[in-house]
Curated annotation (Swiss-Prot):
Gene: PA
GO cellular component: host cell cytoplasm; host cell nucleus
Main subcellular localisation: host cell
Binding-site list for Mn(2+) 1: H41, D108, E119, I120
Subcellular location: Host cytoplasm; Host nucleus
Keywords: Cap snatching, Endonuclease, Eukaryotic host gene expression shutoff by virus, Eukaryotic host transcription shutoff by virus, Host cytoplasm, Host gene expression shutoff by virus, Host nucleus, Host-virus interaction, Hydrolase, Inhibition of host RNA polymerase II by virus, Manganese, Metal-binding, Nuclease, Phosphoprotein
Functional summary from the UniProt entry: Plays an essential role in viral RNA transcription and replication by forming the heterotrimeric polymerase complex together with PB1 and PB2 subunits. The complex transcribes viral mRNAs by using a unique mechanism called cap-snatching. It consists in the hijacking and cleavage of host capped pre-mRNAs. These short capped RNAs are then used as primers for viral mRNAs. The PB2 subunit is responsible for the binding of the 5' cap of cellular pre-mRNAs which are subsequently cleaved after 10-13 nucleotides by the PA subunit that carries the endonuclease activity.
Span(s) of short sequence motif Nuclear localization signal 1 (NLS1): 124-139
Family: Belongs to the influenza viruses PA family.
Presence of keyword Metal-binding: yes
Molecular function GO labels: endonuclease activity; metal ion binding; RNA binding
Post-translational modification: Phosphorylated on serines and threonines by host kinases, including human casein kinase II.
Native organism: Influenza A virus (strain A/Victoria/3/1975 H3N2)
Pfam families attached to this UniProt entry: Flu_PA (PF00603)
Protein name: Polymerase acidic protein
């Protein structure tokens, strides 16, 4: 029988039948009659559909294959022969677009002219018996049944045979031919007698024994047995009626579905108040580096040695003084702290051998700056149960802050190219499989686009600072250790370079829990005059500490050098994530990769090379008040990387909340743009949830502003 099937039927039909039997665990070498029956059924379904089209007037016409009008719309959608998931997707799509009622079982075809699903039956028994079995199983008036037999008989719902007589005759002739061929080979009797009552392959695929017991134990709540759950899943409608879902909820849920139109959404309301301030753990665009090229000094690679060597490259030190005080701090203590750092570094240089680490003297100014003895004494809760007025201390609501232009400038700067190379990804061996070759090619192209990017500098700076601070917090818990803020890079010519941004002094760090805080004072070099944007530097005390000679097109010029000093704090968990900032490279690479995959699937070949080397093509980068901003693929890579880096640098509960809630509104707007006619309930509540996250965080406020630009242009 198997040989007969392979000779008698089209190879595509044979392949589909093999897949169907494999899917339900049936062996076609044993179940040869089943194999023949599936092939026959598939062929009848395809013949039913062949040559039938709908013209522009909506009339059904029969067109032979050579006819130039074959571009007309097919009258029948073939569902049989697809894998289950795809078949249900097609059925759901038809139901959504035509309003047809969803069938309980997968039908074989959909008739676009009559707007109904069709169940095709091919029987070796009495036609009317088989028809009744089908009707009892389907139990739906909306699915049309059409039965064919090998004897030339037929039966259809309400005697409506759908097809013209010639098309039906073609199918009957083919079935009669199959029967004759089987009879000639002595296969017909076995085939005819093997037909059981109406069933599907899936119904006959029974799970028994231990697997059955495990299946019944693994069901979600409210399902008594596997059959009930299977029926529920088969009938589940992903785009089902929201009202129906709501009706199953608590009686207190009272939601009315409102249509979401272009005029529905309003802009997100950003808070009023004083401008927001810089809150990153280290300076970004305003940082200044003291650098040494091709370092080869004694102790090269030891942070303190490197720092002293970098400090020696600058000769413009002067008596420091305060140019922008911290409003609430004791500014003289910040000034004294810097003087202490300079003095203790000088002491180190006077020693015969420079130590590997430097612990600062615990002076009154450092104790104040690091909050020593400032924390309230912790008392065990069990010892205060009897205190009648025990309560949590009052904390003020955070003051609302408005968006300020400096954060957009910071982001723009992070996307720019520098004149240094900040990452060198290690070689990871030869590529063996083709997929590895493609992955390496993508990684190399991406690295070339972002290795000079300022956001990549921030990654390496963040990794170094957090690693050094966590190490010191564990190794020198009671000491006020001096930690240089260092990064390493290469010049365009390939020369190594070590950079010093400033110093951190760590406070006491007995960090038992992940969230226990270690205080530190940061002192960072800069050429930015804080008086230009004083609101940005609210948390800082800024000193003028020297004059730097800069070369420019018009010759040398002197610029004042500033030191930005502030008290800050971090925790083990924050340092742990800071150490892993390189993940930002991976995240943005994956986003670029999904763009390449989308392009490749359209072109049906890998488009990596074209994607990166076609310099003339521009890509959307983001929304601005001017509209959709576009740029080269390199600019897209750097922008995505900068977004990922800023998400890490400015991580906060406000950002988590805004990202989660605004995503819901974004999905609804995208559904509207895709003409999916979305409906919403409690849109006001969603806006409330979004806007309660807009408090004072500069990065969140900027993202909200971008979201408003997107809303404006998306709904034009």
């Amino acid at each position: 029988m198997e040989d007969f099937v392979r000779q008698c039927f089209n190879p595509m039909i044979v392949e589909l039948a093999e897949k169907a039997m494999k899917e339900y665990g049936e062996d076609l070498k044993i179940e040869t009659n089943k194999f023949a029956a599936i092939c026959t059924h598939l062929e009848v379904c395809f013949m039913y559909s062949d040559f039938h089209f709908i013209n522009e007037q909506g009339e059904s016409i029969v067109v032979e294959l050579d006819d130039p009008n074959a571009l007309l719309k097919h009258r029948f959608e073939i569902i049989e022969g697809r894998d289950r998931t795809m078949a249900w997707t097609v059925v759901n799509s038809i139901c959504n677009t035509t309003g047809a009622e969803k069938p309980k079982f997968l039908p074989d075809l959909y008739d676009y002219k009559e707007n109904r699903f069709i169940e095709i039956g091919v029987t070796r028994r009495e036609v009317h018996i088989y028809y009744l079995e089908k009707a009892n199983k389907i139990k739906s008036e909306n699915t049309h049944i059409h039965i064919f037999s090998f004897t030339g008989e037929g039966m259809a719902t309400k005697a409506d045979y759908t097809l013209d007589e010639e098309s039906r005759a073609r199918i009957k002739t083919r079935l009669f031919t199959i029967r004759q061929e089987m009879a000639n080979r002595g296969l017909w009797d076995s085939f005819r007698q093997s037909e059981r009552g109406e069933e599907t392959i899936e119904e006959r695929f029974e799970i028994t024994g231990t697997m059955r017991r495990l299946a019944d134990q693994s069901l979600p709540p409210n399902f008594s047995c596997l059959e009930n759950f299977r029926a529920y899943v088969d009938g589940f409608e992903p785009n089902g009626c929201i009202e129906g879902k709501l009706s199953q909820m608590s009686k207190e849920v009272n939601a009315k579905i409102e249509p979401f139109l272009k005029t529905t959404p309003r802009p997100i309301k950003l808070p009023d108040g004083p401008p927001c301030f810089q809150r990153s753990k280290f300076l970004l665009m305003d940082a200044l580096k003291l650098s040494i090229e091709d370092p080869s000094h004694e102790g090269e690679g030891i942070p303190l040695y490197d720092a002293i060597k970098c400090m020696r490259t600058f000769f413009g030190w002067k008596e420091p003084y305060i140019v922008k005080p911290h409003e609430r701090g004791i500014n003289s203590n910040y000034l004294l702290s810097w003087k202490q750092v300079l003095a203790e570094l000088q002491d180190i240089e006077n020693e015969e051998k420079i130590p590997r680490t430097k612990n600062m003297k615990k002076t009154s100014q450092l104790k104040w700056a690091l909050g020593e003895n400032m924390a309230p004494e912790k008392v065990d809760f069990d010892n205060c149960r009897d205190i009648s007025d025990l309560k949590q201390y009052d904390s003020d609501e955070p003051e609302l802050r408005s968006l300020s232009s400096w954060i957009q400038n910071e982001f723009n700067k992070a996307c720019e190219l520098t004149d240094s190379i900040w990452i060198e990804l290690d070689e990871i061996g030869e590529d063996v499989a083709p997929i590895e070759y493609i992955a390496s090619m993508r990684r190399n192209y991406f690295t070339a686009e972002v290795s000079h990017c300022r956001a990549t500098e921030y990654i390496m700076k963040g990794v170094y600072i957090n690693t050094a601070l966590l190490n010191a917090s564990c190794a020198a818990m009671d000491d006020f250790q001096l930690i240089p803020m260092i990064s390493k890079c290469r010049t365009k010519e390939g020369r190594r370079k070590t950079n010093l941004y400033g110093f951190i002094i760590k406070g006491r760090s007995h960090l038992r829990n992940d969230t226990d805080v270690v205080n530190f004072v940061s002192m960072e070099f800069s050429l930015t005059d804080p008086r230009l944007e004083p609101h940005k530097w609210e948390k800082y005390c800024v000193l003028e500490i020297g004059d730097m000679l800069l070369r420019s097109a018009i010759g040398q010029m002197s610029r004042p050098m500033f030191l930005y000093v502030r008290t800050n704090g971090t925790s083990k968990i924050k340092m742990k994530w800071g150490m892993e900032m390189r993940r930002c490279l991976l995240q943005s690479l994956q986003q670029i990769e999904s763009m390449i995959e989308a392009e490749s699937s359209v072109k049906e070949k890998d488009m990596t090379k074209e994607f990166f080397e076609n310099k003339s093509e521009t890509w959307p980068i983001g929304e601005s008040p001017k509209g959709v901003e576009e740029g080269s693929i390199g600019k897209v890579c750097r922008t995505l990387l900068a977004k990922s880096v800023f998400n890490s640098l400015y991580a906060s509960p406000q950002l988590e909340g805004f990202s989660a809630e605004s995503r819901k509104l974004l999905l609804v707007v995208q559904a509207l743009r895709d003409n999916l006619e979305p409906g919403t309930f409690d849109l006001g509540g969603l806006y409330e949830a979004i806007e309660e996250c807009l408090i004072n965080d500069p990065w969140v406020l900027l993202n909200a502003s971008w979201f408003n630009s997107f809303l404006t242009h998306a709904l034009r």
